Amino acid sequence: AREVIHRQLLPSDEVESRIALVHKPYHQAVQAALNKAHSHFGRSLLIDCHSMPSHDQHDKPLADFVLGDLHHRTLDPAIGDLLTKIITEAGYSLAWNHPYAGGYITKNYGRAATRQQSIQIEINRRLYMTRKYTLDRHGSKNIAALLTRIGEVLSDKLAKA
């Protein structure tokens, strides 16, 4: 069950304050980190991980992982192929760009043509949480191990590219 966070719209001065004090500095720091990586290595890759529900709005089960690259605009296809291989070889189901193709971060920081890449990774909650939204220790260890493997393989691949 979802809980209401705000029962009414925030006052405009509060919204402006949050944008100025949180949103803008955060995104400036992200861009600065990507610029630094790009300057140093000639490329960068931003991985934006999210938790997703186990079923869509029509109660249809979702894949274990949904990867979004805005329909091949933000990620080198070779990196996408490598991610597909790692995830499916670990025994997980995978979908690309549906129902999540990528959001604000993927769109704003992914420019595959300039070697500043981004990928959105949605992870199905049922892999690491119980139905009561508590941590499933076994599942969370498996997901942590897979994410570590992804990081290691991508680091190695990008270092050699």
Specify the residue positions occupied by each region the protein language model found.
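N-terminal catalytic or cofactor-binding beta/alpha core of small enzyme domains
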Residues: A1-L46, S51-A161
